[in-house]
Amino acid sequence: MHPMLNIAVKAARRAGQIINRASLDLDLIEIRKKQQNDFVTEVDKAAEDAIIETLKTAYPDHAILAEESGESDNESEFKWIIDPLDGTTNFIHGFPYYCVSIALEHKGVVTQAVVYDPNKNDLFTATRGRGAYLNDRRIRVGRRDRLADALVGTGFPFREKDGLDAYARLFTEMTQACTGLRRPGAAALDLANVAAGRLDAFFEQGINVWDMAAGSLLITEAGGLVGNYTGDADFLHRHEIVAANPKIYAQMIPILNRYSRVHPAAE
């Protein structure tokens, strides 16, 4: 295992221990509302602090971009992108679908990825050019080649002015185009499950970089494609993502393209 990935795994497991301990008595957790339908808990903060401490002990000069504490002001060609608890709403309701997501970006390219599911003790890892793994077993995206047969994950708009009407139209189209649409509520884990072939595809708009950085590398290392709704590979800071194996990806783009908020550079 790459040494930087090894440190990220250590950090993710530390965060997972904090999350698991807290999940034993959810009534004691302090919950704060960041904005409409968007929550943060003391557990998010404690998990994030543990991750940052672990990473900074090993790599004190690396930059940090984390969901709760924001972006560090130091300049470095290495940047850790962290979501300490993706699926906070699930967590506070006791719905066991959430994860820790950690990615390392080197000169703007994601090179290391960890997504850790503390409920199942499932550890998804990837190093650029070395494949994607689930609990040390090599994983690949699914083999289905028709969107009509695909199980597709997504995320629903949950904030005001997030385009719910447009999404409702897209939801209708995609529901008719695939065999089933699922919204578990933790994008990083959804992407990891696409990499493992448990879901055939995933799409979401209004998504943040820390929700998709690690998962996107897992998918490409597992043989899949990742891009924005236009099909362009420029997605990481565009707040929209589609991911699937190459054949299903190609069938999703004509549907998603009409709903994209990204305008190609040529336009």
Swiss-Prot record:
Enzyme Commission number: 3.1.3.25
InterPro entries recorded: IMPase (IPR033942), Inositol_monoP_metal-BS (IPR020583), Inositol_monophosphatase-like (IPR000760), Inositol_monophosphatase_CS (IPR020550), Inositol_monophosphatase_SuhB (IPR022337)
Binding annotation for Mg(2+): 67, 83, 85
SUPFAM superfamilies: Carbohydrate phosphatase
The protein's required cofactors: Mg(2+)
One Gene Ontology term, aspect cellular component: cytoplasm
Highest taxon in the source lineage: Bacteria
CDD domains the UniProt entry points to: IMPase
Single Gene Ontology BP annotation: transcription antitermination
Localization: Cytoplasm
UniProt keywords, alphabetically: Chaperone, Cytoplasm, Hydrolase, Magnesium, Metal-binding, Ribosome biogenesis, RNA-binding, Transcription, Transcription antitermination, Transcription regulation
GO molecular function, one term: RNA binding
Effect of loss of the gene: Grows more slowly than wild-type at 30 and 37 degrees Celsius, has defective protein secretion, swarming motility and biofilm formation. Increased susceptibility to polymyxin B and SDS but not to kanamycin or gentamycin. No change in the ability of bacteria to infect macrophages.
Regions crossing the membrane: none
Catalytic activity, reaction form: a myo-inositol phosphate + H2O = myo-inositol + phosphate
Primary subcellular site in the record, as a coarse category: cytoplasm
Family classification: Belongs to the inositol monophosphatase superfamily.
Function: Might be part of the processive rRNA transcription and antitermination complex (rrnTAC). The complex forms an RNA-chaperone ring around the RNA exit tunnel of RNA polymerase (RNAP). It supports rapid transcription and antitermination of rRNA operons, cotranscriptional rRNA folding, and annealing of distal rRNA regions to allow correct ribosome biogenesis. This subunit may play a central role in organizing the structure.
Subunit relationships: Homodimer. The rRNA transcription and antitermination complex (rrnTAC) consists of RNA polymerase (RNAP), NusA, NusB, NusE (rpsJ), NusG, SubB, ribosomal protein S4, DNA and precursor rRNA; S4 is more flexible than other subunits.
Name of the featured protein: Putative Nus factor SuhB
Protein species of origin: Burkholderia cenocepacia (strain ATCC BAA-245 / DSM 16553 / LMG 16656 / NCTC 13227 / J2315 / CF5610)
